[in-house]
Amino acid sequence: MGRFIFVSFGLLVVFLSLSGTAADCSSGWSSYEGHCYKVFKQSKTWTDAESFCTKQVNGGHLVSIESSGEADFVGQLIAQKIKSAKIHVWIGLRAQNKEKQCSIEWSDGSSISYENWIEEESKKCLGVHIETGFHKWENFYCEQQDPFVCEA
């Protein structure tokens, strides 16, 4: 009996330690490096997509891509979910006019520690493009309606 309790306790400890290794994501969301991600196929403007993400889950925003590993993960996630002819998908990067200076920042306020531009253009909102496997960033008109990726 004592051996059974010891083995059961050991299995419980292993289970609890493994369950804490990934983010606890809601159903339909995917986990990477402690964050949760979900691709939404419906088309929205950049502003509407950002607003939608904030309402999905506490702390939600359009995705902020902070490393090449995260870019690979997000690109693969989009490629798995978007099977239509849509060629752009919104990410959380947007040019903001502040005190007569234009700055680029993530919608969640995090700093830009990783960059992966396709080319420089004058449009204000950014997304990823199918021709680059959804890896490279490109400027698009903010009022354009496209699918998007939320992160929490």
Swiss-Prot record:
Transmembrane segments: none
InterPro entries: C-type_lectin-like (IPR001304), C-type_lectin-like/link_sf (IPR016186), C-type_lectin/snaclec_domain (IPR050111), C-type_lectin_CS (IPR018378), CTDL_fold (IPR016187)
A single MF term (Gene Ontology): toxin activity
Record note on quaternary structure: Heterodimer with subunit B of AaACP or agkisacutacin; disulfide-linked.
The name this protein goes by in its record: Snaclec agkisacutacin subunit A
Compartments (UniProt record): Secreted
Record's GO cellular component terms: extracellular region
Protein species of origin: Deinagkistrodon acutus (Hundred-pace snake)
Primary location group: secreted
Residues involved in Ca(2+) binding: 64, 66, 70, 151
Protein purpose: Anticoagulant protein which binds to the gamma-carboxyglutamic acid-domain regions of factors IX (F9) and factor X (F10) in the presence of calcium with a 1 to 1 stoichiometry. Also inhibits platelet aggregation by binding to platelet glycoprotein Ibalpha (GP1BA) and functioning as a blocker of von Willebrand factor (VWF). Is devoid of hemorrhagic and lethal activities. Possesses antithrombotic and thrombolytic activities. Also hydrolyzes the Aalpha-chain of fibrinogen (FGA). Does not affect the Bbeta-chain (FGB) and the gamma chain (FGG).
Keyword Calcium carried by entry: yes
Tissues and organs where the protein is expressed, per its UniProt entry: Expressed by the venom gland.
Signal peptide: 1-23
Family to which this protein belongs: Belongs to the snaclec family.
Keywords, in A-Z order: Blood coagulation cascade inhibiting toxin, Calcium, Disulfide bond, Hemostasis impairing toxin, Metal-binding, Platelet aggregation inhibiting toxin, Secreted, Signal, Toxin
Domain of life: Eukaryota
Domain C-type lectin: 24-152
Disulfide bridges in this chain: 25-36, 53-150, 125-142
